[in-house]
């Protein structure tokens, strides 16, 4: 069997370090905040080439806190790509703003710049730049647009830990960056966790206050906030994993390149393309196939686990039925029925990728 995700195998490979750190946290009985969280925040900020990091409860909270901290005009429009996990759009609505969907590029699945331009109105205040599947957006173009229209750039980095755009790691290229440490991520906790990155000190302070009940100091609160804190056990686990991330990423890239070499000339299959200016970290390796569901079942019978990310484009979700707009012609809304995620991760070798590709060719 080739597993889609194998967190147990990953744990076994770092068991001694993980167990030691968890026991250390328990022994010291400092579970919320404290040195473990501070150490991880510093290490992760340095790793991502950012000045400030605020650990939070999860990736969705990171997005909501970031949007709130930016103090955008009330009920303003925020542009979100039509292919992503629901959090990218959900956070916008939960913060009282209006979701405006834009289309994606078919080759790399990131924001389509020309369609984005057509969605901007006087009510637009920000762009959620989703570095989907681990491939950074065209950030240079987004920055030009943001400056022209006075927009904020919120980087959704939930799937792009360590990804680079023109040599710079994502997360602090825009105004603010949001990360998820959901267990299945490239850098995953053993539970929920998230982080916010920025180079703006005042913005980082505000995010930290929002995440901790608007607190100035203990029992002194400047405004209403929320409870969204990265706990010490998760921070300790993430600190161990962060040291391994580059090795795991190299393994993902090797598997992805193997898939591409083996499948790129196959009729009916579309493999993802990578912009030369980016480092793609391949959180997911997503192909397009006109008989996706049949191929998925065929691979299941051959003991190959696969996934679908995502089976329904965001504008087509029942949750967003209230949003007006003609999205039928969106690439995102046409290809969602074709998307298939192949196994990738630290547990997938080049030989595993060749085996999967061989079975796909024999379909």
Q: Where are the language model's segments positioned?
A:
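Phosphate-binding glycine-rich loop
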Residues: 29-77, 91-95, 101-103, 168
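Helix C-cap/helix->beta junction micro-motif
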Residues: 95, 148-149, 302
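PLP-dependent aminotransferase class I/II
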Residues: 8, 20, 37-43, 47-53, ...
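Active-site phosphate-binding strand-loop segment of PLP-dependent enzymes
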Residues: 107-189, 195-197, 202, 341
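N-terminal "arm"/small-domain region of PLP-dependent enzymes with the aminotransferase-like
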Residues: 1-30, 35, 343
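Hydrophobic "anchor" residues on beta-strands that sit immediately upstream
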Residues: 2, 77, 151-152
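Conserved coil-to-alpha-helix start sites within the AMP-binding
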Residues: 84-89
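Short beta-strand->loop structural element characteristic of the AMP-binding/adenylate-forming
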Residues: 98-108, 307
């Amino acid at each position: 069997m080739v597993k889609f995700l194998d967190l147990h195998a990953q744990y076994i490979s770092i068991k001694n370090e993980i167990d030691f750190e968890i026991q250390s946290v328990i022994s010291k009985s400092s579970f919320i905040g404290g040195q473990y969280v501070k150490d991880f925040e510093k290490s992760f900020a340095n790793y991502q080439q950012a000045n400030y990091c605020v650990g939070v409860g999860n990736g969705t909270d990171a997005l909501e806190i970031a949007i709130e901290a930016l103090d955008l005009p009330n009920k303003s429009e925020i542009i979100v790509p039509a292919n992503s996990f629901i959090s990218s759009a959900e956070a916008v609505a939960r913060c009282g703003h209006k979701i405006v969907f834009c289309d994606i590029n078919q080759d790399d699945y990131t924001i389509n710049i020309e369609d984005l331009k057509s969605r901007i109105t006087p009510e637009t205040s920000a762009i959620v730049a989703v570095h989907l599947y681990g491939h950074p957006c065209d950030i240079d173009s987004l920055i030009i647009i943001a400056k022209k229209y006075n927009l904020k750039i919120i980087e959704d980095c939930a799937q792009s830990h360590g990804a680079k755009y023109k040599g710079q790691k994502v997360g602090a290229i825009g105004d603010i960056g949001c990360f998820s440490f959901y267990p299945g991520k490239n850098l995953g906790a053993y539970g929920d966790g998230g982080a916010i990155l920025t180079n703006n000190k005042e913005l980082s302070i505000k995010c930290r206050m929002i995440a901790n009940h608007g607190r100035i100091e203990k029992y002194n609160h400047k405004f209403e906030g929320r409870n969204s804190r990265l706990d010490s056990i998760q921070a300790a686990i993430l600190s161990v994993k962060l040291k391994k991330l580059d090795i795991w990423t190299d393994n993902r890239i090797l598997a992805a390149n193997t898939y591409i070499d083996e499948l790129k000339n196959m009729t009916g299959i579309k493999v993802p393309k990578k912009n030369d200016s980016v480092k793609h970290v391949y959180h997911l390796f997503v192909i397009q196939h006109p008989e996706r569901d049949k191929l998925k079942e065929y691979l299941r019978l051959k003991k190959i686990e696969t996934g679908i990310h995502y089976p329904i484009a965001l504008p087509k979700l029942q949750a967003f039925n209230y949003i007006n707009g003609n999205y039928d012609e969106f690439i995102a809304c046409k290809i969602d029925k074709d998307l298939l995620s192949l196994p990738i991760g630290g547990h997938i070798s080049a030989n595993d990728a060749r085996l999967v590709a061989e079975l796909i060719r024999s379909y």
